[in-house]
Structures are given as C-alpha cells and as structure tokens.
Design a protein with these regions (language model features):
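ATP/NTP phosphate-donor binding region
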Residues: 1-86
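A glycine/threonine-rich phosphate-anchoring loop and its flanking beta-alpha core
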Residues: 101-193
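Short glycine/serine/threonine-rich phosphate/pyrophosphate-binding segments
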Residues: 94-100, 122, 238
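C-terminal charged capping/lid subdomain of soluble metabolic enzymes
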Residues: 173, 274-348
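Generic secondary-structure signature for well-ordered alpha-helical cores
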Residues: 78-81, 147-150, 156-163, 171-183, ...
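Non-catalytic interfacial helical region
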Residues: 76-90, 97-114
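Active-site segments that bind and position negatively charged phosphate/pyrophosphate groups
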Residues: 190-299
Length: 348
C-alpha cells in the first residue's frame, strides 16, 4: 500500500479529503491519556468527527505493550468495527506504532490514518510503514510492515510539546541530516534547541520527512538502504532497554546517545571525519546531557545488542558513515571495539 504524507496547512479540510478516500462504515480515533486532553479537542471540533468512537490507552512508551494492544482490539470490537472501518492514530510514536499494529491485525487489517502530534512521530515513527510493540522487555520486538493510508502532519501540534519532547524528536532529524547532506547537517548542529524557532523548525520538519520518504521508497521492507535509518539505533535501542529497567528515557534521547558511540566507530572503521564527529557529539552533550552508565553495565548492554533485529548470524550489525551522506550499512565491530566505543561515550 502506498502511503501519502501531507504537510498540513488546514487540518480539517485535509482530514475530510483523506477520509473520503478511506471509505468506512465506522470511524475510530486512538489517543493516549495525554493526547486525549491536549490534541483531541481540535479534532472533536470538526464536523467529520462527530460520530467517531474514541479509544484511549495509557500514555508513555512503557505502555507500548500487548496489554495496551488488547485494549485497542477490545475497543474496536466493542465499537462494532468491521473490516471496512477506519482508525485515526492521534498521538506520538507510541500511538502510531501500536495503533498501526492494532489496525493491521484487527480482522486481518483495517485502514488507518496517522496524525502525529510529537516531533518524533512527525519525522520518524508515523512515516514508513513500521507498526510494532515492545515485548519481553525488548524494544520494538513484535510488529509488521503496513502503511497507513495517509500521514497528516500538522506542525501546530508542536506547540503542545515540552522542551524534552522537542529534543527527543530532533534527534531523529539530526540522524536524517547525517545520512543526507552537509548543508542539512550544518543547519541542524547550528540550531538552538534551548530557544527553538518554531517557524524554522516547521520547515526543517518537512525537509527531514523527505529524507525518510526518499529512503523508504527505495527499500520499503529494509532489505538494503533503509538500514541507513538505523544509524544510532544499535546502541540506542540497547540504551533505551537498559534504561527501561531503571529510569526510562525518551526514544530520541536514546538515539542521540546511540549516535555518539556509532560515530566513534565510524571514525575508527569507515573513515568518518573526526571533526564532524566531535561537532555532532558536542551538540548532543550540550542539549541531551549523558546517560549514567559504568563499565559494569557493558555486558548487559552488549547482550541487549545481541537481540537487535538488524543482526545476522548472531553478529551485531551497525550502520556507519564514511562521511555526511556516505552510508555504510551491514557493518560489524568486535566486542573489544564496542567496549572502546562505550568508553568513548562515557569519557569522550
């Protein structure tokens, strides 16, 4: 299924148009407890939403699990959903990931529309057809590839976000800059995240989405170049799963932290320029701080990396860079090199 991404200037009319192309007998909206309060009132003011059934699940990524998935299935079932129904996922990455999976599996699949409300969801989670939940203490363990019919990006929702959630989404934009062009990367590492210019950010969101769209179009099921989007995620997912048992961190923070050791490995193994690595790392440390790991945590982190779905034949798989936009997929590193990269993360 082809996904259409709309950068919205008039949410109501664009939603009406999208719904007219998603013929449906019943309409459902999935929210979490946060977006129900902050974002749903916008949709409820639209005439096209007057008969929509609202399903609400608990907020935060710790609830992106099978219990919440069952709540959504139950809400669809009790609301009388059929194979011809449609669900709108209104929320951040947790909602678009889990809602997409629920819609893709209920009655073998119903149409769904993503309206992302966080920066992270706008530039990453809602685009590209990955639908997924966490399982067994592991991040993004169970899911399917299935495109939403539409993704409608309304950057007005960014005004509902706190600084931490802006930073979280921005990490994926920084990754997109690293795998794209020098000009894009330079703008991203020069941006003041402490006092973000929302107008500038809105334009940058459009640029960032285009990077992901271009890559996904070439490789929808992650057999090759789409692995570029995994930059920062091999260490990042391990950091995120490690933190889940202690003090959970937002996904974008985990990705930002993951970029540090992965750029270090890129310098050591694929010739990424040291100065550009330093500039990127300094930006991350300035706006994201650090994660309080010790060398005693290395074995647990490496074990978590061994569960990464990108791995082949039990070997931990990385995406590295030879330069800005010079993508090297399917790279490996020894355990000693991984530990050196973790040393750099802690001390560099």
């Amino acid at each position: 299924m082809e996904q259409r991404v709309i950068i919205s200037t008039q949410l109501e009319s664009e939603l009406v148009s999208a719904l007219s192309e998603c013929e449906h007998d019943k309409l459902f909206v999935l929210t979490d407890t946060t977006t129900l309060e902050l974002c749903m009132p916008v949709l409820q003011s639209f005439y096209c939403m007057k008969e929509a059934h609202i399903i609400t699940i608990p907020a935060t990524d710790s609830h992106k699990d099978i219990d919440s998935l069952m709540m959504v299935w139950k809400g669809l079932q009790e609301g009388g959903a059929s194979r011809h129904s449609c669900m709108i996922n209104l929320g951040g990455g947790m909602i678009t990931d889990l809602g997409g999976f629920a819609a893709s599996t209920f009655k073998r699949g119903i149409n769904f529309i993503n309206i992302p409300t966080t920066l992270l969801a706008m530039v990453d989670a809602s685009v590209g057809g990955k639908t997924v939940i966490n399982f067994g203490g592991l991040k993004n363990e169970v899911g399917v590839f299935n495109d939403s019919k539409f993704v409608i990006l309304d950057t007005e929702f960014l005004k509902t976000l706190d600084a931490e959630n802006i930073c979280s989404g921005y990490a994926e934009m920084l990754k997109h800059g690293l795998i794209s062009t020098e000009a894009m990367w330079e703008e991203l590492v020069s941006f003041d995240l402490d006092k973000p210019d929302l107008k500038q950010l809105q334009r940058m969101v459009g640029d960032s989405v285009k990077v992901k769209e271009r890559i996904v179009e070439q490789d929808p099921h992650e057999q090759g170049i789409r692995k570029a989007l995994n930059l920062g995620h091999t260490f990042g997912h391990a950091f995120e799963s490690w933190a889940l048992k202690r003090k959970p961190i937002l996904h974008g923070y985990a990705v930002a932290f993951g970029l540090i050791p992965e750029l270090y490995l890129s310098v050591a193994k694929t010739g990424f320029p040291t100065e550009k690595m330093r500039q990127t790392v300094n930006f991350i440390k300035e706006f994201y701080g650090t994660l309080d790991i010790t060398c005693d945590d290395y074995d647990e982190l490496i074990e978590l990396m061994h569960h990464d779905k990108k791995n082949q034949n039990g070997i931990i798989n990385f995406t590295m860079l030879g330069g800005i936009g010079d993508i090297r997929i399917n790279q490996t590193a020894t355990i000693e090199e991984i530990k050196e990269a973790l040393d750099f993360f802690r001390e560099g």
